[in-house]
């Protein structure tokens, strides 16, 4: 069926509206799970220096995440303006954190990049490279921290210290294998479900790891600041890495409950009080999830309203 066929246009409109409705429903469901009064009270009463420092790091983290899509721009060779790429990346990341990868990482990217004139094959490569970049940094940091034994696990937890070290070594081996293939593989092209992917150079792979690792470290620094710097920074970072993989396994939007459960299990008592942890993580959610999501929603609506004009401008420039 031709894309100009009336049935195709109708189907596209229906799918678009279904997507909008799904996003709205997810936002409403998520909003009902949040104690907004408590969230506002925590932010209002927080130490101003720690809060402003954390806000600055949130901005830095979102800018770094935007570099994932800028790397993908270089990798794919598309010509969208860098500011458009950064804006799409910001919107997608905010929705991804709160409403899951399917909505933010995939759905939003396909919606916005296609509206700006990119073909589906290019968008698939952008998403693939972005998610690879994110997890390469995670794997490198988690491998290093788990192997070094920075995270002290409580007795009778789900895994013991030895298992965590073995996991860390395994993660570092994944990094080594990826770098080896990027540096020495002769067959550098692969096709997955009709999409052609090209293995990047080893220098590009190092850039992926560096940018993503810095982003994960900034995220850890935000929580560390909000905890009042009362716990070793690398311990806090390690706990964040453990909670992140737990959130992926449980697959709850925004990891509601998972983040708190892991932090309380690994930090409460000897290191800091349970109340301090809950307050810090609630402030973290407000600064890193809620406020960016509200801004992303506004940016999304503005981008949708300007999409046709921007697409025409992009197609004229290509």
Stretch-by-stretch model annotation:
Residues 1-90, 147-248, 274, 279-281, ...:
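Predominantly cytoplasmic-facing regulatory/coupling regions of multi-pass membrane proteins
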Residues 83-87, 101, 106, 116-132, ...:
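Membrane-interface alpha-helices at helix entry/exit sites of multi-pass transporters
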Residues 91, 95-99, 122-143, 246, ...:
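Membrane-embedded alpha-helical segments of transport systems
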Residues 92-100, 241-260:
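Transmembrane alpha-helix interface/packing and boundary motifs in multi-pass membrane proteins
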Residues 103-115, 144, 253-268, 282:
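Re-entrant/interfacial helical elements at transmembrane boundaries that shape
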Residues 109, 119, 128-135, 139, ...:
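Internal, well-ordered alpha-helical segments in soluble enzyme and binding-protein domains
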Residues 112-122, 239, 243, 261-276:
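Interfacial segments of multi-pass membrane proteins
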